[in-house]
């Protein structure tokens, strides 16, 4: 119980300290007693106070208990970003359960694998994802429409919730990431690991009047920082509606809700620094991460928002969102951004190949210790034992997570990222195991083998390329073959893991030792135009779009009738085109139009106000519906 005398103090002076033994729901309940009428969540026109959040999640927790949910039981969340999603999340914890975020945009095979491994007793859905849930054969738990049940509970008497003893060491969620074995792996995170990243911290200072933006998909661990950073500190969580995403819309939501803190993936942050305009008077701290930071964009952002603090944050899912952070000073002039120093309740050391601690100034594998470490890889003791090991450090033996990242520790404790030991890459904040893509491709009956590489296109843009060796010789000259393979791959892997380019080969080059010579597999050029194509723009709109596409794709002479995505374009590149288009035209452009009209000629006609014939319009609408699924992978995008 909270001391009444404690409640009489000025709520602005109350600071909830980190206690590694407390559960998340206990801390949120304390916040609801400190300031019951403070706004907990904003979602469009909806607002929920801390008292309302506490009471609604209590009622839903009772409902879950009636369905048999108890301590340690898994509950799935096949939901978008929404106010109800946060209520469901908190109610699961109050019932003693463990939540598993499931992205409705993921392919059926991915969802089926996760469902079969976790076997959730209950799965929350909304009206849009209910049909999706019914199509996943291994999703056998009780299906609950979150909106319907919460709507009913809103007008019902609150039943008394039976107290479930949950401590900081108990699991709170299981989040699935890309796995090198060809299957996603579940990372089990404890309550204390979540609390530790947002309470009593050295890289960030939460205030009660802060508004934290929630723009990540719930299956991305940045959500952990957004939701629990707000609720455990008595702040307001501003949930960005899960609709068509654009930089202008992102900035608009931030401005309208008075966002003061946000996290952006590195790629999205770079676009934000390049294109986001307008006044954001309450914005005081932006964090970015998920890929190597760009000093140029950091400086550009600080010039545009000189009063805003900017931090480059680093951390694998296995260490709960962040493990290190670097605050970029206004006068930063270096050519590389470090990933910073260890955040509070976290340890960092650099190890050699024998897992011995190295002194500052030596490169080695980055290992992380502290309260942020995951409990395990769900139902995978061998993998857990491989990545979570005891290391003899100067401070004594510590349980550490081996990141696979190569880094260098400076004498002052600052860490610089130097590369990877394996074939894992990060694109738009998403961790991608290239081996997982290769495994999926090698299961395709039309292929005898496949190699997947990540190439740099320009100074920073990463491009996943699949090199395909078909079984049938006729496929070598079949232009439809790569598209057919990628179509089958989309039924297996999330959109963000689908290669943006393919190369069909009759054989792979070999080293003298007889192994595939991956270094000899060069990136294909961006195929901009067919030899017989009319690539010359004839209108102002076509000229402008050709320039924007060339800048985004790194190609010249683009065919006016080639689909943006067929040219290897990604959703992040499309956002770049959209932002540039709005900036050049000086007016808003519906981002959906770029999906619906995905060639230069079609989009130019749309911009000029010219109509398409009915058949082409229907085809464009159908194509847009498929291609817009990629936007759901953004986080602060979403992505």
Question: Where is each model-derived feature located?
Answer:
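Glycine-rich loop motifs involved in handling phospho/adenylate chemistry
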Residues: 44-48, 74-83, 102-109, 215-216, ...
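Regions immediately C-terminal to embedded phosphopantetheine-bearing carrier domains
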Residues: 71, 171, 528-639
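Short amphipathic alpha-helices and their capping loops
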Residues: 22-27, 306, 402-403, 409, ...
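AMP-dependent adenylate-forming
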Residues: 1-14, 23-24, 123-164, 194, ...
């Amino acid at each position: 119980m909270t001391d009444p005398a404690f409640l009489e103090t000025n709520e602005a002076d109350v600071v909830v300290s980190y206690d590694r033994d407390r559960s998340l729901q206990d801390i949120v309940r304390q916040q609801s007693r400190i300031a019951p009428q403070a706004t907990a969540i904003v979602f469009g026109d909806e607002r929920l106070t801390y008292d309302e959040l506490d009471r609604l999640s209590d009622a839903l927790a009772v409902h879950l208990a009636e369905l048999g949910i108890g301590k340690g039981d898994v509950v799935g969340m096949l939901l978008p970003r929404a106010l109800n999603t946060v209520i469901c999340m908190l109610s699961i914890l109050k019932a003693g359960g463990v939540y598993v975020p499931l992205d409705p945009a993921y392919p059926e095979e991915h969802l089926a694998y996760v469902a079969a491994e976790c076997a959730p007793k209950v799965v929350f859905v909304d009206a849009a994802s209910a049909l999706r849930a019914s199509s996943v054969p291994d999703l056998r738990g009780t299906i609950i429409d979150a909106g319907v049940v919460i709507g009913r509970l809103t007008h019902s008497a609150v039943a008394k919730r039976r107290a479930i003893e949950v401590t900081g060491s108990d699991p709170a969620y299981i989040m699935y990431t890309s796995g090198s074995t060809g299957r996603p792996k579940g990372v089990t995170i404890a309550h204390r690991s979540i609390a530790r990243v947002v309470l009593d911290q050295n890289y960030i200072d939460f205030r009660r009047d802060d508004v934290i933006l929630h723009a990540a998909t719930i299956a991305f661990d940045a959500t952990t920082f957004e939701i629990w950073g707000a609720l455990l500190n008595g702040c307001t969580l501003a949930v960005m509606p899960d609709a068509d995403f654009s930089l202008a819309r992102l900035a608009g939501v931030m401005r309208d809700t008075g966002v003061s803190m946000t996290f952006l993936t590195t790629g999205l942050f770079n676009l934000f620094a390049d294109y986001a305009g307008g006044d954001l008077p309450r914005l005081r701290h932006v964090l970015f991460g998920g890929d190597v930071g760009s000093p140029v964009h950091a400086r550009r952002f600080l010039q545009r928002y000189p009063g805003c603090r900017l931090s480059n944050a680093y951390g694998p899912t296995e260490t709960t969102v962040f493990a290190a952070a670097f605050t970029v000073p206004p006068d930063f002039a270096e050519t590389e951004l470090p990933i910073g120093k260890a955040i509070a309740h976290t340890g960092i050391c650099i190890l050699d190949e024998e897992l011995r601690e190295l002194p500052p100034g030596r490169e080695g594998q980055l290992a992380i210790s502290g309260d942020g470490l995951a409990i395990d890889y769900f139902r995978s003791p061998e993998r857990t034992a491989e990545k979570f090991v005891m290391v003899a450090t100067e401070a004594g033996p510590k349980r550490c997570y081996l990141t696979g990242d190569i880094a260098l520790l400076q004498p002052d404790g600052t860490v610089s990222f130097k590369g990877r030991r394996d074939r894992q890459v990060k694109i738009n904040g998403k961790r991608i195991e290239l081996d997982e893509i290769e495994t999926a491709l090698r299961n395709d009956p039309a292929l005898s083998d496949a190699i997947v590489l990540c190439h740099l296109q320009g100074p920073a843009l990463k491009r996943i390329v699949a090199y395909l060796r078909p079984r049938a010789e006729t496929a070598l000259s079949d232009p439809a073959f790569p598209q057919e393979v990628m179509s089958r791959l989309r039924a297996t892997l999330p959109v963000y893991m689908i290669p943006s380019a393919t190369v069909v080969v009759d054989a792979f080059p070999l080293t003298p030792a007889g192994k595939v010579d991956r270094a000899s597999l060069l990136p294909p050029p961006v195929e901009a135009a067919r030899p017989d194509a009319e690539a010359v723009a004839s209108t102002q709109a076509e000229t402008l779009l050709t320039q924007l596409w060339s800048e985004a794709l790194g190609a010249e002479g683009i065919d006016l009738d080639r689909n943006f995505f067929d040219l290897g374009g990604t959703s992040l590149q499309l956002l770049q085109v959209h932002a540039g288009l709005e900036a050049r035209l000086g007016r808003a452009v519906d981002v959906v139009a770029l999906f619906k009209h995905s060639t230069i000629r079609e989009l130019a006609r749309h911009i000029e106000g010219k109509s398409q014939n009915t058949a082409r319009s229907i085809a464009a609408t159908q194509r847009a519906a498929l291609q817009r699924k990629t936007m759901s992978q953004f986080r602060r995008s979403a992505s």
